[in-house]
Amino acid sequence: MIIVTGATGRLGRQTVDRLLDRVPAHRVGVSVRDQRKAEPLRARGVRVREGCFTDSESLAHAFEGATQVLIVSVDQFGEEAVQQHRTAIEAAVKAGARRVVYTSHMAASPASRFQACRDHAATEEILRSCGAPYTALRNGFYAASALQFLGPALDSGQVALPEDGPVSWTAHADLAEAAAAILADEGRYDGPTPPLTATRSLTFGDLATLAAGITGRPFTRTAVPDDVYRRHLAEAGVPADRVEGLMGVFTAARAGEFAAQDPTLAALIGRAPVDLAASLREQLA
C-alpha cells in the first residue's frame, strides 16, 4: 500500500488524486490529522487513518502495511520541522516500507540562506541513514508562494518587496503529478531527484511586467530595504522566526539558489509544466 501524508493539504490532496489515476484505490492510504476532511477520499475507496508527525504511535497505525510512504514536509522552520520529519521517517521504516519518499526542495543545502532549505538538507541526511531506500523530491519553489507575496500589489499596483533574484516558480499541480508518477513507478529515482522545476525563472520585476500585461494596469516594482521589510512584518504580528524565514526567501533568491531549470519535471508529467504567467492570469481573472 502507498501511504500519502498530509493528504488534505494542497500538495498531498492533488498527489492522491493523480495517484488514483495510476493505481487502484485499495492500494492507496492516507495519513491525516483530521479524518473528517478526508471523507471524500474514503468514499473513493482510499484507506483513511489519523496520523500526526508528533505522535509516533498514531503513525504506526496510519502507516500499517505500507510499501511506500510519501512524507509531505511540514510548514514550519527549524529543529521542530526536522524532528517531525525524523519521527515520520522512523515510523515509515518501522512499518516496513520498502521506500520512503519525501518532498524536499530544489535548493536543499546546509549552506542555504533560506532556513527551510537547511531543514530539508537535515531531513535528507536523516533519510540517507534511515536504513531504507529513499527518494527526495527536489521540488521547485511553489508558485503559490509567489502569488501570496504578490497579493497586496494586485490592488495597489505596487510590488514593494526586498530585492530578489530569479526563481523557478513551480505549480503544486505539476509537482503532485510528478510525485504520483514516481510513487506508481517505485524506484524510478533513488536518492535526491534532479530539480523538479518549471521551464523559466522569474523575478518579481518580471511578475510586475506580466501583471501589467494581463490587466492593462501599471504595476511598479520597488525594492524595499531588508530592515524595513522586517519591521513591516513584525508590525503586522508575524512571529520573529517566521520573519527571518520569509527574509531568507529573498536573500537566497539574490544568491541564485532558486534559479535552476531542469527538464526532469516535464519528462515525468509528459508535458510542459504550467508557467507562472498562467497562474497569475487565473488569479487576476
Residue ranges of predicted features:
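Oxidoreductase cofactor-interface core, primarily capturing Rossmann-like NAD(P)-dependent enzymes
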Residues: M1-R36, T54-E57, E64, D75-Q83, ...
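Short loop/helix-cap segments at secondary-structure boundaries that form the rim of catalytic
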Residues: K37-R44, H61
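Compositionally biased, low-complexity linear motifs
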Residues: F63-T67, L284-A285
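Residues lining the SAM
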Residues: T5, V72, G270
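Rossmann-fold cofactor-recognition segment
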Residues: R42-D55
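A hydrophobic C-terminal alpha-helical subdomain
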Residues: T215, D227-A285
